[in-house]
């Protein structure tokens, strides 16, 4: 959150938003801080897409530094192409709830990392391809349920209001 707060949040919406963003025009209960937390979750989602691709290929401290740079600098820059009135917005680009901005950015960042890092250690041997099995099915199942239930709030927030007729 610190990288996104320090530089990314304002940069995503262009130079007119460097100090305070007026979100009350949409909904009086939707404050700048509410929008900041919501957009920070989008930025974190882009970083988690990369984390899944580089798992077991990088050390945690190196990934944390990378994630701060990704979330604080690269993601807001790419987000400003659409949300900040950038060239994509000028071309009439439609992106409901940031699905393309978040997932395409995360996917391309993950692809770039995988190209640089190469395959996981031990995946390819002289005898051919060695399968690397999952480590913890209970943890994987917990992750699926957390993602499943968390997505309801995430997608509901995408319409900037918690009203049933908007999120259905």
Describe each model-derived feature in a short phrase:
Residues 1-168:
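Hydrophobic alpha-helical transmembrane bundles of multi-pass membrane proteins
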């Amino acid at each position: 959150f610190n990288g996104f707060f320090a530089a990314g949040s304002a940069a995503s919406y262009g130079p007119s938003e460097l100090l305070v963003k007026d979100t009350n025009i949409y909904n009086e209960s939707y404050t700048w801080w509410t929008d900041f937390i919501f957009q920070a979750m989008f930025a974190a989602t882009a970083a988690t897409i990369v984390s899944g691709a580089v798992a077991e290929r990088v050390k945690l401290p190196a990934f944390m530094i990378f994630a701060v740079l990704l979330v604080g600098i690269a993601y807001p820059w790419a987000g400003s192409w659409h949300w900040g009135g950038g060239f994509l917005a000028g071309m009439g680009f439609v992106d409901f709830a940031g699905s393309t901005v978040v997932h395409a950015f995360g996917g391309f960042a993950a692809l770039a990392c995988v190209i640089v890092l190469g395959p996981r250690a031990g995946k390819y041997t002289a005898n051919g391809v060695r399968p690397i099995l999952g480590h913890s099915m209970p943890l994987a199942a917990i992750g699926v349920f957390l993602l499943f239930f968390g997505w309801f709030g995430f997608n509901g927030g995408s319409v900037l209001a918690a009203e049933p007729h908007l999120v259905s």
